[in-house]
Structures are given as structure tokens and as C-alpha cells.
């Protein structure tokens, strides 16, 4: 069996899909369906079982067995970069992850988990997986950074696989439940379909992020599991592209609309990553050599998926 925490969420459900595409269906999805809209991410997928996150954590802490586990993909977390409840964030992202990690280490189960580019904070260069480059801007980034630091202490002694992926700006299918935290591409598409002018912040040609397609993210996860490589790795494309490029690809698909530029909100000033670009040196050294989709390629594929029933 394979366990995917956060399996009804954005990246988790895409990992379930990638496993299904390889003929793997013996999957336990762990999630919190308090947000009932997330179930739509699972309706076209094949899984063996579902468990609530709280029940799962109780069983993990009690050391209960789930049968033979081939791997745990730990994608379950509070991923809101605007959540400032530090206790909630640390319980959800740090303590929960530690419990799962030790469960896996004791049983030599491969443990693949979601870290984040938020660990780098407001940098504009050198997004490198090393302590001197890490200075998170928000409590979400701090919770991810702290767990990475914890993993770094354990990695040299570990007898089983531990791998963390620092996701950059992931976009693509199955993110609709994320609301305001969904990608720019998702929001632009919604605005166009509602007959509204698609909106970007003023200066969006100057805001550049490493936008990575979720299908590529799932592919990297599975490759590392299949190849048993451990470590903490950036997971982006290695290219910074502008929000304007995302908008251009969206408009090109729809063949209509023009962008309305809105003022940059005061509440985000100083807490907003204006530039991200993954350094892929370590990922490539580990042996992953496949190309990543450009914004034009990924957004076009995503638009086709979003508008498949239109």
C-alpha cells in the first residue's frame, strides 16, 4: 500500500493520479474533508481507502500498523502563506511531519514530503538548498524550514529514504478548492469565464516566479521514490517567468479579453516574493534529467483541462 497524506488536496491528488497512471490503486488517502469541496479531486481516481487526518495521526502516534507500506507521500499541511496562527501552523506542519517521519524511520518506509520555496523568504537570487540562503517571511515558511532543518540532522544516520521537495509556484489541475491561494492562471480563467476583465497587480511584468506545472511535480515525486534518492531538493523549472506571461498564455487560449491592472495591496508589501527561481543543480545531480514545461506549455494544457466541458 502507498499512503498519500493531503491526498484530496492539490498536489496530493495529482500524485494519486500519477500512481493510477502507473497502474497503482492500492492507495490510502489521508485528508481532512472539512472542506467538502475537495472530494471532487478524487472522483475520477482509484484508491483503496480513505482516512481522516486526525484518526490517522492517532494511529501513527500509537504505532499501529497499516499492513505493508511501500511509501508515504506526505503532502498534507496548512499551505496558506497568509495564515498567522503560529500554533496551528506548527502543529499541522511541523509536529505532524515529525511523527510521520519517525514512524517511517522505525519501519524503513520511504518518506517523501512537501517542503516549500517559502523557506527562502524574500531572496531575489541564489535559491539554493543550504542554510545560509534560508530566511522565511511568514510562519508557513518557517514551519517548513524548521522541518527541513530537523530532517538534515537525521539524514546522515537514516537507513531508509527521506526526501523533501521545495515546491516553487505550482499550478495546474485540481487546485480549485484552494480559493484565494489557487494560482494566477486559475483566477484569470475564472474571471474570463465569468465575463470579467482578468486582473493582475500593476508591475506584473516585473514580478517573476518559477511557475511549475503540477504534472511535472508529480513526476518528480514518483521518480525519486522509484530511484530511492534522499535529500532536500528544489522543485521548480529553473526559469523565472512573469505573471504577465501567465496572463498572455491564458488570453491566447481563450482568444479574448485584455488585462486590467489593479494597485498592489498594502498588506502584501514586504511579505511578497517578487522573484523566485529554483536552482536545479542538486536535482539534476541526483539524476532527474527530464525537461519541465514552460509557462506557455503548462498553462495551455491547464486551460484545456479547466475548460474541457465548456
From Swiss-Prot:
- This protein's UniProt keywords: Carbohydrate metabolism, Isomerase, NADP
Which N-terminal stretch is annotated as signal sequence?
Answer: none
| Sequence positions that bind NADP(+) | 10-11, 31-32, 38, 53, 75-79, 92, 144, 170, 178
Q: Which residues form a coiled coil?
A: none
**Carries keyword Protein biosynthesis?**
no
Q: What class of enzyme is it?
A: isomerase
Q: Give the catalysed reaction(s), semicolon-separated.
A: ADP-D-glycero-beta-D-manno-heptose = ADP-L-glycero-beta-D-manno-heptose
Could you tell me what the cofactor note in this record states? Binds 1 NADP(+) per subunit.
Active site location: 140 (proton acceptor), 178 (proton acceptor)
Query: Which cofactors are named for this entry?
Result: NADP(+)
Top-rank taxon of the source lineage equals: Bacteria
Query: So, what pathway does this thing act in?
Result: Nucleotide-sugar biosynthesis; ADP-L-glycero-beta-D-manno-heptose biosynthesis; ADP-L-glycero-beta-D-manno-heptose from D-glycero-beta-D-manno-heptose 7-phosphate: step 4/4
CDD domains cross-referenced by the UniProt entry = ADP_GME_SDR_e (cd05248)
Which Gene Ontology terms describe the biological processes this protein takes part in? ADP-L-glycero-beta-D-manno-heptose biosynthetic process; carbohydrate metabolic process
> Is the Transcription keyword given for this protein?
no
Record GO terms (molecular function): ADP-glyceromanno-heptose 6-epimerase activity; NADP binding
For the ligand (substrate), the binding residues are 169, 180, 187, 201-204, 209, 272
| The protein's Enzyme Commission number | 5.1.3.20
**Pfam families cross-referenced by the UniProt entry:** Epimerase
Looking up InterPro entries in the UniProt record yields:
Epimerase_deHydtase, Heptose_epim, NAD(P)-bd_dom_sf
Q: State the family named in the UniProt similarity comment for this chain.
A: Belongs to the NAD(P)-dependent epimerase/dehydratase family. HldD subfamily.
Query: How is the quaternary structure described?
Result: Homopentamer.
Q: What is known of its domains?
A: Contains a large N-terminal NADP-binding domain, and a smaller C-terminal substrate-binding domain.
Describe its function.
Catalyzes the interconversion between ADP-D-glycero-beta-D-manno-heptose and ADP-L-glycero-beta-D-manno-heptose via an epimerization at carbon 6 of the heptose.
Protein name listed in UniProt = ADP-L-glycero-D-manno-heptose-6-epimerase
Taxonomic source organism? Klebsiella pneumoniae (strain 342)
Amino acid at each position: 500500500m502507498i499512503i498519500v497524506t493531503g491526498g484530496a488536496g492539490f498536489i496530493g491528488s495529482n500524485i494519486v493520479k500519477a500512481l493510477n497512471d502507473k497502474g497503482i490503486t492500492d492507495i490510502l488517502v489521508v485528508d481532512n474533508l472539512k472542506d467538502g469541496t475537495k472530494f471532487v479531486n478524487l472522483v475520477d481516481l482509484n484508491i483503496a481507502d480513505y482516512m481522516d487526518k486526525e484518526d490517522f495521526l492517532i494511529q501513527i502516534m500509537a504505532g499501529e500498523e497499516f499492513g505493508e507500506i511501500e511509501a508515504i507521500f506526505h503532502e498534507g499541511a496548512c499551505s496558506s502563506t497568509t495564515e498567522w496562527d503560529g500554533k496551528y501552523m506548527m502543529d499541522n506542519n511541523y509536529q505532524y511531519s515529525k511523527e510521520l517521519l519517525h514512524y517511517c524511520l522505525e519501519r524503513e518506509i520511504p518518506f517523501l514530503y512537501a517542503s516549500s520555496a517559502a523557506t527562502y523568504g524574500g531572496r531575489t537570487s541564489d535559491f539554493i538548498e543550504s542554510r545560509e540562503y534560508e530566511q522565511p517571511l511568514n510562519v508557513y515558511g518557517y514551519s517548513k524550514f524548521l522541518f527541513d532543518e530537523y530532517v538534515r540532522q537525521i539524514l546522515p544516520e537514516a537507513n531508509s529514504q527521506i526526501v523533501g521537495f521545495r515546491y516553487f509556484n505550482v499550478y495546474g489541475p485540481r487546485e480549485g478548492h484552494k480559493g484565494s491561494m489557487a494560482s494566477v492562471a486559475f483566477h484569470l480563467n475564472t474571471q474570463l469565464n465569468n465575463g470579467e476583465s482578468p486582473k493582475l497587480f500593476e508591475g506584473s511584468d516585473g514580478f517573476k516566479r518559477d511557475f511549475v506545472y503540477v504534472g511535472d511535480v508529480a513526476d518528480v515525486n514518483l521518480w525519486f521514490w522509484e530511484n530511492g534518492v534522499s535529500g532536500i531538493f528544489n522543485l521548480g523549472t529553473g526559469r523565472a517567468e512573469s505573471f504577465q506571461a501567465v496572463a498572455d498564455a491564458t488570453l491566447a487560449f481563450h482568444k479574448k479579453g485584455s488585462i486590467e491592472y489593479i494597485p498592489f495591496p498594502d498588506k502584501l508589501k514586504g511579505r511578497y516574493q517578487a522573484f523566485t527561481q529554483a536552482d536545479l543543480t542538486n536535482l539534476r545531480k541526483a539524476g532527474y534529467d527530464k525537461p519541465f514545461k514552460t509557462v506557455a506549455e503548462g498553462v495551455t494544457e491547464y486551460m484545456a483541462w479547466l475548460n474541457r466541458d465548456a
